[in-house]
């Protein structure tokens, strides 16, 4: 009789599974009721307008039907979809939206067709006409839930059998038995490290339970394979399971290399092509009875065709009876062949649910297996683990409960305990008595590993010497650049206005700004020689994954873009993470799952780039540790370094001639804090020695962390960044403007934040500023702008032309110009040209010299020097009134985008802003982008107040009067009409008299 603990567990699990099932059914129902078929097809869960192309009989007499798009001319291809082999689908008639004809399993999916396997029970109900149109819709998996419930009920009723002692241990009714002695082993894999060898010995010596905890990259699968091989060597029969087909196939591939007799159970459609030779189908096809089975199938196909052709009811009945007899014989012969195949295999592999009693394993005795191995146990529902556990006296669980938990649809069921895996429950209950942890990882650079080790694995992990310092630049054909020379890169979007999409009807989240940053970083890696196939882009949100695919797949077909859940167990040389969340509320939502972030970061081998808004993610403690770690041990960049047209928060034209100055406004006092977009590059062990002096103290949050301010000679005094550093750069630039020098170079010792400051200050003063060089040799050159276009029309050197004057630093009034006077670096200042022209006219009127004398540059020079002495900011220009040059400059200004730094032409495509009377390109035509945001809002408020129209199409304000006021006006009108009528009556009487 089952214990109280078992009964309580089974009752609770059945209730939670019912919640989960109801949630999944409700989700599928909402798809069908609330979403159009076209929308379902665009989401990839439905295929419309299909026709039947072929039918045949498959394994176990199943009917295989191939569907393809209905052709209208040339051959058509299927639309983009998420259908994969093994999915359960419903077949519908296109003419009848609500009627489901049958359910089946996808066996093959290509770009032009899909093949569905239907059970034999559908054969006679299905009458598929090649001329009709059909559709396929993904369905919830009823089979899985039925098997889970069946296993729980079997656990509750379990009295005596091979798993009795194991059940007592797993539910805490008895302690694990003492370990047995193991003779010294000869390992099949001679490259195992100490922790792996210890785990193998421990697993083999335990009598009921052993847990192998394998953090990312520690060779967990290698260890599990060694355990299986050693068990087979001892003469044990092993049942090896995992929650997913991919995990099982991975074990099959590894065991096949060791020449073991293995058998893979499962639907043929769900197996990788590389291991199908080890599947039950393939083994049966190679058996002695294969030809007889093939002949019986052929007979079934022939009788089935005859049944379709005949119209006689008696003949149809005879054909059906014949098919039933043939299928019975087919089943008997297949079962005999299956039993022979099962008993000849040393290792049988299947998914947890594939090991159920209603599958091929029902042919074996109850105590056939000696040990059950469950890989990736931490990702499996505990109920699914009990399907194989009831078949053996000992179990070995392997996985990592610090990574993703089992996937569930019902949030309520997950919180109530459905997401608690068997491995996590037992590890917390028994601890080191049953757990062995692998400690040497063979995947990640030590800088990538250390964060995960410290935050998730108690600092137990160490990097193997072969991977401890490997970088992208060490790959063959990859150049050494800033991107390929760092293992950790943080691109901070804080303060850049790259907010997430706010779609009320979207459950998922997206961020187009981060998509652009990802694209630019990938291009930098590819340009450096990193193959796109070695790069992965990972995001926690499916909507962001879709946006990334739309933007990147056509340029980089080999690039892999997946969600975090879809990438667990995988690895790439470079991984780019898009965290998506960027909002003023500081909500992180889905990112709050610590284990999901652990999985995302630990997929990378040599380089991981995190793109996020530090101001948002720092609201979550765990994410804050990640940002702080990248800040201290990696390179930090702001999104401003990637995107030229970023619109920072609080953007305004009022205080500068460019966008950079407004972007640098901190949220707090300028002397003590700065925004997250202005982070300093952090030092790292694998970076250049110059960066080592810029490491920041540990334990401080990113928001309050103070970067070091390096001096121009390469020093890096510690302390909080103050206004003095900015003032130092500003003083240098002002001194340069007052000097006769035309160019000023800043040394390469500046970090990225200092370079950003220099760019901003140079832009404020209207100077040119360019960054040159790569890596440690990157420096900034600030230069004075070339003379105005009119200077080119003056006389050549040596002909008495005017000598060029040095630029004069602009006054505060000049730096605070209104928005309409914003201009790009190559656009002439029309206001200055106009003032110079007026000055020349006045000068000509006050000087009685001849026109020839006025045209002489040498006679004009003394007067200009005199005017300069009086403090007028005039610029030396030729004395001729070049009206054509003025017109040409005006035309050029009208044909160029008015946004600072933008030189795009607006002759063909451009938008005119009525607020500032300038033309802008399509990237900058919105008032909020080019600096007219406040004016646009004021204009909109005035229009709404005047017209009563909130937005286009909302209609106008009701113009009807208030009823009381209308009645009052009506009374006044009636009174006035009465008075006028009385006046006319009195006049008539007077005339009559």
Curated annotation (Swiss-Prot):
Q: Which PROSITE patterns match?
A: R3H, ZF_AN1
Mutating residue 382 to K: effect? Answer: In HMNR1; severe reduction of ATPase activity and loss of helicase activity on RNA duplices
Please give one Gene Ontology molecular function term for this protein.
ATP-dependent activity, acting on RNA
The UniProt annotation places ATP binding at: 214-221, 403, 442, 571
Q: Where is this motif: Nuclear localization signal?
A: 864-868
Answer whether the UniProt record assigns the keyword NAD to this protein: no
Compositional bias per record (Polar residues), positions renumbered to this chain? 653-662, 669-681, 842-859
- Give the region (Disordered) as residue ranges: 651-723, 782-828, 841-879, 971-993
Q: What is its EC number?
A: 3.6.4.12, 3.6.4.13
| Record: residues binding Zn(2+) 1 | 897, 902, 921, 924
What's its top-level EC category? hydrolase
Q: Which disease is it linked to?
A: Neuronopathy, distal hereditary motor, autosomal recessive 1: A form of distal hereditary motor neuronopathy, a heterogeneous group of neuromuscular disorders caused by selective degeneration of motor neurons in the anterior horn of the spinal cord, without sensory deficit in the posterior horn. The overall clinical picture consists of a classical distal muscular atrophy syndrome in the legs without clinical sensory loss. The disease starts with weakness and wasting of distal muscles of the anterior tibial and peroneal compartments of the legs. Charcot-Marie-Tooth disease, axonal, type 2S: An axonal form of Charcot-Marie-Tooth disease, a disorder of the peripheral nervous system, characterized by progressive weakness and atrophy, initially of the peroneal muscles and later of the distal muscles of the arms. Charcot-Marie-Tooth disease is classified in two main groups on the basis of electrophysiologic properties and histopathology: primary peripheral demyelinating neuropathies (designated CMT1 when they are dominantly inherited) and primary peripheral axonal neuropathies (CMT2).
As for family, the record states:
Belongs to the DNA2/NAM7 helicase family.
For this entry, the protein name equals DNA-binding protein SMUBP-2
């Amino acid at each position: 009789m089952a214990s109280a603990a078992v009964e309580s567990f089974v009752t609770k699990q059945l209730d939670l599974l019912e919640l989960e099932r109801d949630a999944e059914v409700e989700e599928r129902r909402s798809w069908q009721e609330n979403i159009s078929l076209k929308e379902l097809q665009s989401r990839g869960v439905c295929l419309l307008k299909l026709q039947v192309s072929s039918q045949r009989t498959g394994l176990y007499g199943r009917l295989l039907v191939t569907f393809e798009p209905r052709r209208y001319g040339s051959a058509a291809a299927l639309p983009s979809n998420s259908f994969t082999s093994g999915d359960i689908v419903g077949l519908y008639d296109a003419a009848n939206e609500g009627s489901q004809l049958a359910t089946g399993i996808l066996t093959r999916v290509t770009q032009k067709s899909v093949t569905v396997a239907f059970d034999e029970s559908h054969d006679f109900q299905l009458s598929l006409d090649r001329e009709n149109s059909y559709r396929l819709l993904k369905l919830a998996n009823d089979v899985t839930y039925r098997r889970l419930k069946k296993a729980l009920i079997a656990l509750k009723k379990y009295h005596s059998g091979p798993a009795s002692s194991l059940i007592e241990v797993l539910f805490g009714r008895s302690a694990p038995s003492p370990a047995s002695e193991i003779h010294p082993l000869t390992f099949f894999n001679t490259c195992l490290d100490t922790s792996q060898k210890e785990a193998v010995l421990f697993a083999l010596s335990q009598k009921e339970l052993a847990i192998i905890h394998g953090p990312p990259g520690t060779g967990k699968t290698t260890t599990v394979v060694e355990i299986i091989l050693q068990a087979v060597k001892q003469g044990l029969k092993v049942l090896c399971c995992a929650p997913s087909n991919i995990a099982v196939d991975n074990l099959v591939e590894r065991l096949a290399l060791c020449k073991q007799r293995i058998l893979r159970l499962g639907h043929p459609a769900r197996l990788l092509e590389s291991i199908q030779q080890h599947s039950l189908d393939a083994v049966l096809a190679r058996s002695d009875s294969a030809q007889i089975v093939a002949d019986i199938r052929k007979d079934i196909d022939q009788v089935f065709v005859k049944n379709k052709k005949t119209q006689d009811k008696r003949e149809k009945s005879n054909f059906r009876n014949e098919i039933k007899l043939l299928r019975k014989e087919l089943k008997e012969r297949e079962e005999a062949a299956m039993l022979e195949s099962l008993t000849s295999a040393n290792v049988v592999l299947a998914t947890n649910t594939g090991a159920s009693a209603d599958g091929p394993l029902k042919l074996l005795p109850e105590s056939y297996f000696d040990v059950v191995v469950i890989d990736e146990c931490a990702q499996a529902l505990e109920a699914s683990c009990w399907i194989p556990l009831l078949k053996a006296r000992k179990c070995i669980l392997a996985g990592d409960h610090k990574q993703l938990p089992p996937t569930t649809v019902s949030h309520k069921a997950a919180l109530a305990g459905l997401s608690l895996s068997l491995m996590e429950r037992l590890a917390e209950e028994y601890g080191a008595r049953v757990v062995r942890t692998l400690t040497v990882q063979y995947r990640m650079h030590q800088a990538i590993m250390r964060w995960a080790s410290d935050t998730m694995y108690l600092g137990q992990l160490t990097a193997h010497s072969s991977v401890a310092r490997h970088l992208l630049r060490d790959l063959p054909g990859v150049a050494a650049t800033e991107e390929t020379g760092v293992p950790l890169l943080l691109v901070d979007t804080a303060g850049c206005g790259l907010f997430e999409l706010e779609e009320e009807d979207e459950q998922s989240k997206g961020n187009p700004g981060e998509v652009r940053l990802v694209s630019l970083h990938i291009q930098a890696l590819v340009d450096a020689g990193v193959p796109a196939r070695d790069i992965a882009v990972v995001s926690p949100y499916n909507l962001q994954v879709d946006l990334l695919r739309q933007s990147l797949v056509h340029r980089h077909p080999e690039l892999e873009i997946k969600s975090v859940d879809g990438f667990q167990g995988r690895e790439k040389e470079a991984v780019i993470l898009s965290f998506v969340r960027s909002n003023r509320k500081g909500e992180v939502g889905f990112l709050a799952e610590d284990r999901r972030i652990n999985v995302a970061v630990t997929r990378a081998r040599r380089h991981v780039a995190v793109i996020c808004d530090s101001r948002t993610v720092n609201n979550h403690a765990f994410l804050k540790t990640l940002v702080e770690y990248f800040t201290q041990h990696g390179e930090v960049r702001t999104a401003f370094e990637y995107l030229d047209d970023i619109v920072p928060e609080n953007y305004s034209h009022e205080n500068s001639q460019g966008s950079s100055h407004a972007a640098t406004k901190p949220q707090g006092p300028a002397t003590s804090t700065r925004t997250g977009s202005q982070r300093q590059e952090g030092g790292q062990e694998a970076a250049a020695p110059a960066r080592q002096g810029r490491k920041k103290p540990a334990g401080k949050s990113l928001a309050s962390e103070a970067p070091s301010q390096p001096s121009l000679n390469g020093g890096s005094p510690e302390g909080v960044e103050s206004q003095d550093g900015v003032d130092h750069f500003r003083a240098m630039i002002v001194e340069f403007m007052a000097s006769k020098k035309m160019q000023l170079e800043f040394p390469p010792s500046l970090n990225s934040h200092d370079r950003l400051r220099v760019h901003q200050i140079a832009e404020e003063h209207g100077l040119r500023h360019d960054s040159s060089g790569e890596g440690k040799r990157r420096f900034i050159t600030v230069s004075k702008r070339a003379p105005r276009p009119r200077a080119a029309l003056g006389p050549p050197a040596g002909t008495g032309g005017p000598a060029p004057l040095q630029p004069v630093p602009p006054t505060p009034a000049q730096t605070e110009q209104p928005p309409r006077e914003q201009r790009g670096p190559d656009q002439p200042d029309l206001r200055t040209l106009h003032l110079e022209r007026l000055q020349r006219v006045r000068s000509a009127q006050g000087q009685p010299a001849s026109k020839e004398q006025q045209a002489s540059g040498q006679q004009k020079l003394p007067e200009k020097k005199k005017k300069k002495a009086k403090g007028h900011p005039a610029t030396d220009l030729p004395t001729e009134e070049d009206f054509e040059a003025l017109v040409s400059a005006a035309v050029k200004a009208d044909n160029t985008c008015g946004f600072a730094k933008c030189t795009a032409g607006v002759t063909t495509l451009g938008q005119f802003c009525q607020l500032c009377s300038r033309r802008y390109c399509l990237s900058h035509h919105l008032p909020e982008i080019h600096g007219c945001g406040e004016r646009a809002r004021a204009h909109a408020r005035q229009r709404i107040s005047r017209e009563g129209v909130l937005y286009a199409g909302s209609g106008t304000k009701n113009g009807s009067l208030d009823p009381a006021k209308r009645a009052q006006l009506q009374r006044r009108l009636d009174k006035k009409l009465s008075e006028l009528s009385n006046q006319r009556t009195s006049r008539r009487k007077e005339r009559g008299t």
